[in-house]
Amino acid sequence: MYSSSNSFLGGVNNARPGQPPFMQQPPYSQLPQGQQQIPQQTGFQPQPTGYGSQSASHLQPQPTGFPTGQLQPQFTGFPGAAPPQQQQQFGGYQAPAQQPQLTGYPPQSQPPSLQVPSTTGLPTRLAPRTSSEIANSFSDGAGVAPPPPPKSSGSKIPNIRLSFITAQDQAKFEQLFKSAVGDSQTMDGEKAKELLLRSRLPGSELSKIWVLSDTTKSGQLFFPEFALAMYLCNLRITGRELPSTLPDKIKNEVSGMVDIISFGVPDTEPQGAARTNVPSFDAPLLENKSAPPAPQHPKPQQPSNAQFLSQLAAQPTGFGPQATGLQPNQPSLLGANATLAPQTTGFPGQSQQQYLHSQPTGLMTNPQATGYNGPRPPLPPMPTGFGSNLSSMQTGGLAAQPTGIPGQWGFVNAPSSGLPNIEALKQQLMPQPGREGGFTTAGLSGNASIPWAITKEEKKIYDDLFRAWDGLHKGFIGGDTAIEIMGQSGLDRKDLERIWTLADPSNRGRLNMDEFAVAMHLIYRKLNGYPVPNRLPPELIPPSTRNLNDSIGAVKSLLSQDAESRKASGAFLQPQKTGVSYLKEHSFRGGARSPGFGRKDATLFKNNDEAAAGYRSSARRRVGNDARPSSPPTSQASEEELSVEQLKKKIRETQIMLDAVDFKDENRAEEDEVLDRRDRLEAESLMDRTRRVQDDIDTHPNAVFRKLDNGAERRSLRRQLQAFEDQVPQIASEVRRIEREIADAKLELFRLKDAKAHPNSAANIVGTGPGGTVTEADRIKARARARMQARAAELAGRPVPASVDDDGAAVRRLEAESASIRADREKNEAMTRDVEESVREFTRSLEDSLKEEGETSTREHERRRWEDALGVEDVIRDFIYDLQRGSRTAHIRKEEESRASAQEQRLRHEEPSPGVSRLSPAPSAGSAGSLPGSTHEDRVAAARERAQRRIAERMAAAGLKPHTDTSETLLQRQEREKREREERLRRAEEEDAKREQERQRRLAEEQRSTSDTPAKPVGKKPPPAPPSRRGRTDSAGQAEVKKAAEETITAEQAAREQAIREEQQAQEEETNRLEMEAQKREEELLKEKEAQEARLRALEEQVRQGKIRKQEEKRRKEEAERLAKEKEAALAAQRAEIERAKERERQLQLELERLDEESSSDDEGPVNITPEDSTPTQSQLLPTVTPAAPVSAPESEQAGSPEDTSSQAPPVDFKLETESKNPYFKITHQATDTQVVSSPPVPQPSFTSPKADVHSTNPFHRLAKQETSKPAFTGSAPLERKSRARPEADDDWSAAGSEFDSSDDDDDERPGGGSAKQLASILFGTMAPPRPLSAMDDKSPSKSSTPVQDSPVASLPVPESNGSLSAPAAPPPPPPPPPAAVPSYDPSVAPPPPPAPPMAPPAPPPGPPPPPGPLPPPAPPAASGPPTPAGAPDRSALLASIQKGKGLRKVQTNDRSTSSIAGRVLD
């Protein structure tokens, strides 16, 4: 609120008489050289006496202080004026090596200017000084004691909390009020005006604030009134209006606090104690009750000199004031930590003080100037030097020195320049209501000099912040809270992350008090321009962390040293040899010299039985025949202390305690027994439930499939897979070896063939050289042999052999063949590698499939524990085994049932064929072997038997004798297996009976009444007995029987083969028929798809033309709307005139009734009224004519309204998408658009532009647009409804109805004007029986005024008035499937005939086709309806010819069928 500092610098001080502005005061170093005082050579440095001189030209300062024979005066603290020559030498003079130090102020001469000495009434508070200064102050004030000034009671503000401001604001306002009024209780109007003007509010607003704040109407403000004024200023600055009157609550609070302050002010002030120059050592060193607020806020104005002069009386000193040696007219150079008040000097009314200025006095650490009382800027560097010939050095203000160890926390004072903006940072980060509404970081940044270490003031502020945020006193602040606190500082997120990393070195995610102080100090440094360090300096490491780390390091070093010493001394190996504990020397308490060395600690403990007090018998410690040793003194003392009665009493008490303990133990044992019994009952109930669940699982029809995925079979298959995988490399090596052999054989075969084809080739020469090489002699011999063979052939009359080839031809042929063989070998090698890789991949896939999902060691352990009963108690083991036995029994029983049912089914299936019943066990065995519940070995055997049987059948069919196996026959094996199954079933039934008996006994013992006792399982029907064998009567009968059996088998085989062949033929015929039907359907679907694509292309072309028309019609419509609005305005004006005329007529009628005369007044009335009557008569016709235009075509309006909505939706959507940024508005508009456009349209690039997609950032909005614009196969009717709307539908609502006929004529003459009829006939021709063209022609004249050629769907809502379901009102049909997935039509229902061709474009527009009636939900749209095999090609050709402009001839359609889904339009 007080962000401007201009008012502190020049705005207020200009109004003070006798004092120039702050920036225009004469500098302290511009006094002439001749007027500078020269100290007297008396051996002492002149000291300030605190009094002004009577005459500056005659009196000199008194010589006091230290001898200065070899010393020159030096400016320490706030120096006086220096000559101009000294100022010019500031930058170039080098000080000597040894600079004598001098406390005090050098003598200064007084300028001849007149200044009024100012006095202050602020209480004196002394800051720390050196001992020499304190001694000098005693010597200076020893002679004369100034008269005591009156003591002020001070500004006392009651400790009352105001509810309309926060506690922080109230404390800030208290500081501001105290600094402004000093010891007074009220603030006068001028001071309040100065403070309120800093808010930069207009004068009218400040006047209202003053009227509301000055509740006492005294022209002065008490503190509650001042706080109220600040509160009202804040309201107005934040943009809220000022109340006209104060609320009662605020008014009562302010009035009550004002009364308390008024009653607490005494009538007369007591006489205060005399003020001396002796510092007050009892006051706190840093106490400053009159200091202004912290520098981060602009400091209020100090009281003026005139006010202090009016409060303080001048004190005579007995002689003329003396020169103090201080620089006159010294500028205000104090900061916020000035703690000393100036002293009054001299008589203020003396005329001799015309050469004196106001004197700043006090101790030298922080002297305060009295010439200016405004806000003090930070202290700039001061020049110092030696006397008049030495230049001064640039030094800053006296900074507070740390009083503790360097780098220690909390012992560093604030720098001399203070901590700017620290209070603002505190107020910003304090938890307060309304902070979520927004905050500003203005005023937090600065460029102050901040040390690394945390100062006392900072630590206190940060601790207060920590306690304020740690409301639950957890001792730490979590990450979420720290983010909220640190985020209010306005720093970058990366800087805050680095600060958090430095403040939380342990990565705990929370900060304690010291770590929070480190984080806040780093934030404060960053706000003042310091970078965030990469690692914490030693000054910022919290003491707790540093001490903890040191302690941990010390413990680690002790442990490591102890381990090394024990290792070196061998104490690890022979502890009994030393007999001492080395831990004793390294005790945590210290070394051998520590005070507690004699005491034992936790490093070594040994129980001392001797130290036990009480009675102890010595009979156990008698040694041999020695006398009984004396009891220890402790035992004697205990016996002496306790008498027999006391011992008996203790025994009784102990007995009582033991009995109580026994009773508790008995109770506990009973409770444990009850719990054990309850646990047993629960365990037994759980076991029963488990048995019942297991029985349900075993008896479930799908329980047989549960055995397919057991662990044993998986492991067996994995072992087989591993064995096969091990065989793969061996097989691959064998393949490669065979490939090599094949290649070598091919090469050798080629050599042989080549030698046979070229017998005289050089390749056939046998080499006799080393290594079988061919030499020149071998070639000569070969040529000689060839010549001899040629001569012999010539003599014998045989053909002469071919000449010998050269060496190159044979070699080339061999190389070519070798390359070909090598290429084939490499190709085969690549194939082998591919096969190996494929086998490996297949093996990996099989291994993954054979692995149990989620198989881990824990899962395997649990599975083996509860399935294999490993590591469980005996009861649980017996229970698991019982469940497994029951499961196996149920599995065997179910397997027998399945086999029996399969056998019965096969017998039932083979009954028609004679003689097959005796072979029924064989197929039953085969089918049973392939059951899922059988084992792997059974399935393998069954597969082998089936393969053998098929081989035998094929051999028998080929006339070959099958191989006779001397081993067990099929019938014998089946008999054996049947006996084994019967035995297993019998054992399973016995186990079931035993288990049921056990269960019944257990139920009887538990005395549980069950309503439905499960009955014993009924015995299963035994499988049919094997075919009985005929007894052998004699050998002849046996031969006949065997022969008859063979003939029967042969006949059965022949019949079976004939049946198989017939079945195969039937299957082939059925397959051919299905293939032909599928091919036919595919052709029909392809034709339908082509026709649909052609229709879609035509529709797209018409949609494009319709868009162009809509753009033009939109412009016409907007113009019509504008004209309609103008007409409506004119009509409104005419209605107003009518009303006024009516009112005038009524008034005139009243006047006529009041008139008593009947002469000329009756005639004059109608004469005046007639024009006014004519006006409403003419204008009243307009409202009746105006609605007549839409009445002429109500059907078109009703029909066009839904289409207008759908057609106009996309342009509005485009506008909204490009302009609106509101996500909620986008979502609402998207939902509305989705409801209006119910069916997906044909992709229309003009409706959704790329620009709209770019500007829309809502992902759901983009997804909805993509789904809306997705080009799916939809019906033609939804496409037409979406893309083509009546452009003149909106014009029907206007008052001007003259555009209907003209627009209709224009539509007829357009190139695509007649396309609507064609499109309507195409769309709805398959949905309803087409009407004859004669009927359409009859209806066309009556409908000529309606623009049907542009809106064929306009008549869709008409059936809605009759109660039938209309297309727009019905929910949108589901999207049709793609053409390839169209279901086959029902052949029993004839397809609808093709639509009647519409008239040519030049012909008059016919009436609209009848719309579809109420459609059932599963009915697809017209375009994706049942295909018409005969009409589809003609319709496609017809549509193509229509597109080319071909004229259509009139045809007569005979409606032979009526579609079940077609509707009818009621006229």
UniProtKB/Swiss-Prot annotation:
Pfam families: DUF1720, EH, WH2. InterPro entries: DUF1720, EF-hand-dom_pair, EF_hand_dom, EH_dom, WH2_dom. It is found in: Cell membrane; Endosome membrane; Cytoplasm, Cytoskeleton, Actin patch. Residues 25-48, 77-101, 919-934, 1183-1197 have a biased composition (Low complexity). GO terms for biological process: endocytosis; endosomal transport. SUPFAM superfamilies: EF-hand. PROSITE patterns: EF_HAND_2, EH, WH2. Gene3D superfamilies: EF-hand. One of its GO terms (cellular component) is cytoplasm. Residues 292-301, 1369-1381, 1389-1430 have a biased composition (Pro residues). Residues 1154-1165 have a biased composition (Acidic residues). Keywords: Actin-binding, Cell membrane, Coiled coil, Cytoplasm, Cytoskeleton, Endocytosis, Endosome, Membrane, Repeat. PANTHER family: DYNAMIN ASSOCIATED PROTEIN 160, ISOFORM D, EH DOMAIN. This is Actin cytoskeleton-regulatory complex protein pan1. It comes from Aspergillus fumigatus (strain ATCC MYA-4609 / CBS 101355 / FGSC A1100 / Af293).
